[in-house]
Amino acid sequence: MKQLYTRWGKNLDRDHVLEEYPRPLLMREDYQILNGWWDYAFTIDYKQPQQYEGRILVPFSPETALSGVGRQLKPDEYLWYRRNFDLPGWDREKGQNRILLHFGAVDQSCEVRINGHKVKRHTGGYLPFEVDISRYAQESANELIVAVKDLSDTSYHSKGKQKLNAGGMFYTAQSGIWQTVWLEKVPETYIKEIKTVPDIEKKIIRIKVSSSYSTDKKNVDKLSRNLPIEIKIRKPGLYPDPVVKPSQISTEDMLETAVLAVSDKWIEIPIESISLWNCETPYLYYFEVKLGDDRAISYFAMRKFSLETKVHEEFLRICLNGEVQFQNGVLDQGYWPESLYTPPSDAAMIFDIQEMKKTGFNMVRKHLKIEPQRWYYHCDRLGIVVWQDMVNGGSYYKHWFVTYGATLLSWLRIPMRDVYPRLLSREAKAGRLEFIREMKETIRLLGNHPSIAAWVIFNEGWGQFQTEDMTRIVRRLDPNRLIDQASGWFDQGGGDFSSLHNYFFKLFIRPERERASVLSEFGGYSYREPGHCAKEKLYGYGICKNKKDLEKRFLERWSGVRNLIPQGLSASIYTQWTDVEEEVNGVFTYDREVRKIEPFQ
């Protein structure tokens, strides 16, 4: 495979890697980024190595060019990371503060050790986790060890588009630390979580603040238990420039102050003159939360996604703030040639989102991957709607059934039930339980982001099971968003959408009374831009001779989409945003250097 680089990968400052504050919805002043050079080693046995093989640039996976390693972690191996760090002024004997160690994501299972102590085990390659290391931390020369195991696509764990034997619509498998690692100093009792739910009809924002007392009641004294929580909301604003650290947010011009007696209780705060969030004016309300000695900055937006039938129409339409919005989306795999899952920089993420909007898209479907939280923050502040996929898992996919057979059944309008665990790769009970846990954690992680309009539970039958039960779980956890329960096929008749994929046939929809019609994947036309392809082999859904041919076929297909809108079509999603390895059907090339489809309306 030819190694391509984006401009951000070429210009990466390896001494300052992804240093922006990684959690925009709960920001604090006192933090330390641990990205940078770590020691690494591969082993066959689960035994900490005495010697390390070299240095790896965290948070880039060892399979990537930017990591400096360029080696695949195999299912029968372990990957070990090591680095030292200091905590100036830290004195654990005083017990006045805590040190939290955060990992944005580690693929797939890992164990964390601090100064020889095993402090955390975690499984789930797409979700963040933290560990309180106060008990074992010292002022200087702390040793941090992370041991990683990644079975990739050989097990039922979540894997997205990763495949050890990559090809076609599946891409190079990656492993290990792939999102930011960071430390945070907090008081003994600190703000653990902030939840926000806007209500534009009532003109209120509902906020719930949870403290560390909620999860550590035995070790918190009575005084800490009763600490009041103060919330100050700032006037709404537009943020064309990104916030990279909490000190950039002024606490002046506050709208409202509220005091809560205890944590874990919802409070309703009136917003008298609301500024609505939309794609043209994505207003954000920053607010400050104080709990004793702890202070955090967060934000929310006033907006509402809904399905409504408008006057003189018989179809349900997707609405934003009560107004019909045709969601013209693009499928985004979130891959980078030099760094796979990890965006090479904050600017790289911003480029993708801004160019999506320039192209004419007002929505992006994040496909089978959970991005770093800053990606969603940029969607919030720049004003683009997000459909978020749950990450697929399950055993080896039987493509003769879930891909080729399902395409034909969908065209023939023959329904297929989700009661065949062997055919749908969901025989393992442990895998089903793991999917449910990760689905819940995904909603909890991303639920505050105003840009997210819909949760996509299953894609094309990959690991699909108990679809109606999963839909009920999601609806209970988040009743304020839309649900695509089965994107593509294996529709079980629930959720908010009749969701079709159509790459090969004449475009059509099946209008329903209870659900909106969406074309959740279409297009996928392939064109190889000379000098900008990672592989010689080509994959896509219709091969174009040149850029002009691609543009012609795209516009013809887009015209077909537009003709379906009066018939009830509410959203469409073009495949895809960029080329990825063999799949050269992007609006942009893999290296983001050549636009293959010009902006359209």
Where are these regions (language model features)?
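N-terminal pre-domain segments of enzymes
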Residues: 1-31
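Accessory beta-strand-rich segments of carbohydrate-active enzymes
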Residues: 2, 39-45, 71-191, 214, ...
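Substrate-binding clefts and catalytic carboxylate motifs of secreted carbohydrate-active enzymes
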Residues: 26-48, 173-176, 189, 436-437, ...
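Conserved, mostly hydrophobic/aromatic
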Residues: 38, 116, 181, 285, ...
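Active-site mouth of glycoside hydrolases
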Residues: 113, 127-130, 134, 143, ...
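Short strand-turn-strand beta-turns centered on an Asx-Gly dipeptide
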Residues: 113-119, 292-293, 321-322
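Extended acidic/polar, glycine-enriched regions
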Residues: 135-141, 210-310
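Surface beta-strand/loop "capping" patches
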Residues: 185-215, 312-317
